[in-house]
Amino acid sequence: MGAVYRSRFGRTILEADNVWFTLLTLNTNPIHFDAEYAATTEWERPLVDSTFTLALVTGLSVEAVSERGVNLGWREVRLPAPVFAGDTIRAETEVLEKRESKSRPGFGIVTVRTRGLNQRDEVVIEFERSILLPL
């Protein structure tokens, strides 16, 4: 426990990623795709959809901690800083707990805390996740 895994690479978010994701998920909040509206907010430009950030950081963590596993759920999702098109995001994951599954022989449950960091090393998202993995 306490082991920390870092994604091998980061991912620069494109404006198109954000626009396509908001269209795909039918998110109609103009803060994500209307530059004129976003200019009137405290951020002055469109924010990346936070569920895109969650999906991206989860994906960046898969190779290191859950490539053969099944996601059981997220908890304690926090968004301490905004994400914008052009930001490069990477993931760091710390193992919090490991135990054998009580209901599935041959499997274990790992609980991790993952943080997404931008190119300035600011934490932009943090969450806990439980994963079912073969032993």
Model-derived features: positions:
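Hot-dog-fold acyl-thioester-processing enzymes
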Residues: 1-73
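Short, surface-exposed secondary-structure edge patches
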Residues: 44, 80-81
